[in-house]
A protein has these predicted regions:
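Short, small/acidic-rich helices and loops at N termini and domain boundaries
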Residues: 6, 49-52, 76
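Conserved functional hotspot residues or short segments at active or partner-binding sites
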Residues: 353-354, 358-533
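Cleft-lining beta-strand/loop regions that shape enzyme active-site pockets
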Residues: 25-40, 44, 48-56, 60-61, ...
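Polar, glycine-rich mid-to-C-terminal structural blocks
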Residues: 300, 312, 319, 323-391
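Hydrophobic membrane-insertion alpha-helices, especially the h-region
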Residues: 8-25
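Residue-level recognition of conserved beta-strand edge/terminus positions
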Residues: 138-139, 170, 357, 406
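Extended, small/polar residue-biased N-terminal targeting/export presequences
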Residues: 55-116, 162-195, 517-528, 533
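Surface-exposed patches in mature extracellular/periplasmic domains of secreted proteins
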Residues: 54-64, 80-85, 234, 264-266, ...
Length: 533
């Protein structure tokens, strides 16, 4: 438990997904015609005017107004939120599933912008950029050695489609003058399906990281591809999926459920009940199905999980889901900002609400509830649903299993959190960015060896340098005052597996990472066992 407390801040910085605040988008944006408008000035407006005209120091009334809105929303539910105009573009990119840019992943370390990955057939790939390139300038702006931020670089590299940006760079192995490369920006996909591959001759695996406007199309393409390869059983991984566009999760549920089965319904004080039912023949209505969930599975992911559990269509494996059963509708405000207001609750086919309890007077307890599961040991030992459960319901299939509302979705089969990476030294590898820097450096230095592997499975089976890589990491980590020499044996093994997965990610991105790390994942192993029975 002591190790848990040390590791928790890092865990939640990585695990909890920004998609949770996106909520559900039931309709298109609705423009606000009267928000905070009245024939007579409101008290809030009067106070802002008085501060602006008479306050002793200079202040930003825009900032005060934003804070006033945030204060107002803090007395509602935990998921009603105000999104300033400056943050809307990034949020819309997540929902749309693409953005305009040059198609690279980069990381700043040693005060240098390093190209970590280049999107195949993307703008940078076509312009000749390579992994290992180091940017000196973007346009006329020097970006090396001046403490520039990731956000600043991202803003320089993104821009309207077909517009051009010139980068000046140094290339590994070249000792002449820096290169200048001009790149035409293009549409860069943000895939919501991380990976889809055949585990064996009959079992396919698909992982969805969020629900964007392109998710169902991505999912359908993945399913049809795997079916052509012989898929008869499926493992669907929704771990760490914080939700997104509700309609996309409904479409995927329709691929698993037959007839006109109810998938979910929503209702609120000012929102009449709306039922969402199956409308078409699904892509995978008959094959055996297992879902993987954890405490990061939330919102639209819980809609899908709840529907499949209620109809006994899938076996749920993993840990209790987050417990977000509130529907947000975005209202576009006149300045380009957006109010995401909770307008309804969603209910699974049995009628249960998955929303966990909250107090309108403050959200601290609500925000810390998942962390409390770690401190209480629930994620290690499972739970009986007794301390968080609401009303009991019976599933709608022949087994008539008992399920509960009011606190997320409890899996049918529990698999605890793997604590083998919770030692203090390993935690520091993540917090300090040491692990990412090492992986990049090692990969760039050994590129010819990695190019001999045909794919992730070949790499996992044929890579024999784990000990060599671990020893190199041990020496590298000492530069950041991290000592791995006394790490417990079990933690060392887990770290070696993670190193292999991260190296695979350098070559094949998320497809490589999950295809390798799944082979060492207890929850995945359990899912494969159950789906094969």
């Amino acid at each position: 438990m002591k190790k848990l407390k040390v590791w928790l801040p890092s865990l939640f910085a990585i695990v909890m997904i920004v998609g949770m605040i996106i909520g559900f988008r039931l309709r298109g944006n609705i423009r606000s015609n009267g928000f905070l408008k009245a024939r007579k000035s409101s008290t809030v407006e009067e106070v802002l005017d008085l501060v602006n005209n008479y306050y002793v120091d200079s202040v930003s009334t825009d900032t005060l107004g934003d804070n006033a809105i945030q204060g107002m929303l803090s007395h509602l539910d935990p998921h009603s939120s105000y999104i300033p105009a400056v943050d809307m573009a990034e949020m819309n990119e997540d929902l749309q599933g693409n953005f305009e840019g040059i198609g690279i992943e980069f990381q700043i370390f040693d005060d240098t912008v390093n190209v970590m990955n280049v999107l195949a057939d993307g703008p940078s790939d076509k312009a000749g950029l390579k992994v290992g390139d180091k940017f000196i300038k973007v346009g006329k702006s020097v970006v090396a050695g001046n403490g520039i931020s990731n956000d600043k670089i991202r803003g320089m590299l993104r821009g309207p489609g077909a517009s051009k940006v010139t980068v000046t760079l140094l290339r590994v192995g070249e000792h002449g003058e820096p290169r200048q490369v001009t790149i035409s920006r293009g549409t860069i996909p943000l895939p919501s399906v991380d990976v889809a591959y055949m585990v064996n001759k009959e079992t396919g695996y698909i992982r969805i990281n969020r629900f964007s406007e392109t998710t169902h199309a991505e999912f359908a393409q993945a399913v049809m591809k795997l079916q052509q390869e012989g898929m008869q059983r499926m493992i669907l991984d929704l771990r760490e999926n914080g939700g997104g566009v509700l309609q996309e999760s409904i479409e995927i549920a329709d691929d698993f459920l037959d007839d006109d089965k109810l998938i979910v319904y929503t209702v609120g004080v000012h929102s009449p009940r709306v039922d969402y039912r199956c409308k078409r023949d699904g892509l995978f209505e008959k094959g055996k199905l297992v879902l993987l969930t954890d405490e990061g599975t939330a919102s639209a992911s819980e809609v899908l999980t709840g529907a499949l559990q209620d109809w006994e269509r899938a076996t749920i494996i993993g840990r209790r889901t987050f417990g977000k059963g509130l529907v947000q509708q975005p209202f576009e405000l006149t300045d380009g900002s957006s109010l995401h207001l909770t307008i309804a609750r969603y209910y699974t086919p049995t009628g249960r609400s998955i929303q966990k309890p909250y107090d309108n007077s403050g959200h601290n307890d609500y925000n810390e509830e998942v962390m409390k599961r770690f401190h209480d040991g629930e994620v290690l030992h499972g739970d009986t649903s007794s301390h968080h459960a609401g009303l009991a319901y019976q599933t709608l299939g022949p087994e008539k299993r008992t399920v509960y509302g009011g606190g997320g979705i409890t899996p049918d089969i529990f698999v605890g959190f793997d604590t083998s990476t919770l030692s203090h030294s390993i935690t520091l590898l993540y917090i300090n960015g040491t692990l990412n820097r090492f992986i990049y450096t090692w990969y760039v230095q050994h590129l010819p060896a990695f190019r001999t592997f045909k794919g992730p499975a070949d790499f996992d089976a044929g890579f024999r340098d784990q000990d060599k890589v671990y020893d190199a990491l041990t020496r590298y980590a000492l530069k950041d005052s991290i000592d791995l020499r006394s790490v417990p044996a079990a933690d060392k093994i887990t770290l070696e597996h993670r190193l292999k997965g991260l190296l695979a990610r350098q070559i094949w991105r998320t497809e490589g990472f999950f295809e390798v790390t799944n082979n060492y994942d207890p929850a995945f192993a359990k899912a494969l066992e159950v789906v094969s029975q």
